[in-house]
């Protein structure tokens, strides 16, 4: 704390010292001048002392102010150090948490990599299953040609006649000859698969009266031709003829690669058909 006494000036009691206040004819002129100079020197010393005291007081006041500032700085530094310690502790905790996170992330990345491998394997299996399912769906999907011709009058002669050539000139009541009956090459074709083909031909019509021995014959061309024959009694007025069979189709086999020509002929007399239904199914 500043000493207030330093702020009190030195007071000189003898404020005037000159030749008028000294005894005359006692001291020499040199001594009188010396005494007068001493008074001046004392005044100068007092002034300097007052200036020094004032400076010392001002310095102590400034020191007191700086002490307050330093105390505030020390307090703030202490608070900052405490905050820094807290920050260091939190940083250590954060680093520990980060290390834990890095460990868990590394584990997760390893798990994800394993899962990616398993997902890729599953995707490959799914793709394989989809391919197999598509194949199974295709294999179990029925392909069929079913055509009905009704209200017609078609003569089936006694000479061998290509059945597809005969049918393609007619207008069907329902259905189409495709895909099993090729109207360009006039033959029956099959899908190149190891699947059985079922065939049925139903014809309604009549032979001329008086025809004794009569039958309908259908031949399928092939390495070993198959022939179907339906015989009818002469007493029957309206004849319902049914010719049905099946073919065990082999992939890349003769029937799959060549198809089969269907040749029909009426034995005994020409046959007039009024309704025809032909079905092929694989």
UniProtKB/Swiss-Prot annotation:
It holds the Pfam family Phage_tail_NK. The keyword Repeat applies. Gene3D superfamilies: 1.20.5.170, Sf6-type phage tail needle knob. Residues 61-139 form a coiled coil. L-glutamate binds at residues 146, 200, 248, 250, 255, 277. It is found in: Virion. Its main location: virion. InterPro entries: Phage_tail_NK (IPR032395), Phage_tail_NK_sf (IPR038681). The tail needle knob is bound to L-Glu, which might play a role in the assembly of the phage tail needle knob in vivo. Homotrimer. The trimer forms an elongated coiled-coil (280A x 25A). he N-terminal tip may exist in a pre-ejection extended conformation, which may fold into a trimer of hairpins only after ejection into the host. Interacts with the tail hub. Interacts with the head-to-tail adapter protein. Belongs to the Lederbergvirus tail needle protein family. This is Tail needle protein. It comes from Shigella phage Sf6. The lineage of its organism: Viruses, Duplodnaviria, Heunggongvirae, Uroviricota, Caudoviricetes.
């Amino acid at each position: 704390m500043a000493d207030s006494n330093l702020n009190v000036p030195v007071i000189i009691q003898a404020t005037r010292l000159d030749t008028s206040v000294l005894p005359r004819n006692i001291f020499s002129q040199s001594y009188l001048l010396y005494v007068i100079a001493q008074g001046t020197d004392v005044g100068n010393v007092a002034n300097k002392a007052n200036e020094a005291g004032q400076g010392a007081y001002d310095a102590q006041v400034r020191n007191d102010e700086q002490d307050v500032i330093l105390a505030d700085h020390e307090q703030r530094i202490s608070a900052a150090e405490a905050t820094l310690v807290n920050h260091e502790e939190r940083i250590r905790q954060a680093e520990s948490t980060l290390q834990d996170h890095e460990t868990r992330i590394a584990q997760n990345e390893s798990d994800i990599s394993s899962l990616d491998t398993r997902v890729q394997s599953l995707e490959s299996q799914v793709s394989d299953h989809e391919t197999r399912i598509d194949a199974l769906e295709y294999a179990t999907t029925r392909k069929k040609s079913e055509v009905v011709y009704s209200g017609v009058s078609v003569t089936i002669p006694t000479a061998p006649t290509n059945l597809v050539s005969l049918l393609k000139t007619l207008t069907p009541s329902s259905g189409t000859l495709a895909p099993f009956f090729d109207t360009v090459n006039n033959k029956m074709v099959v899908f190149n698969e190891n699947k059985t083909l079922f065939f049925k031909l139903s014809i309604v019509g009549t032979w001329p009266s008086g025809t004794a021995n009569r039958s309908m014959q259908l031949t399928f061309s092939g390495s070993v031709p198959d022939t179907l024959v339906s015989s009818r009694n002469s007493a029957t007025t309206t004849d319902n003829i049914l010719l049905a069979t099946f073919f065990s189709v082999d992939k890349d086999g003769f029937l799959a690669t060549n198809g089969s020509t269907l040749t029909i002929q009426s034995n005994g007399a020409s046959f007039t058909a009024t309704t025809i239904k032909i079905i092929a199914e694989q």
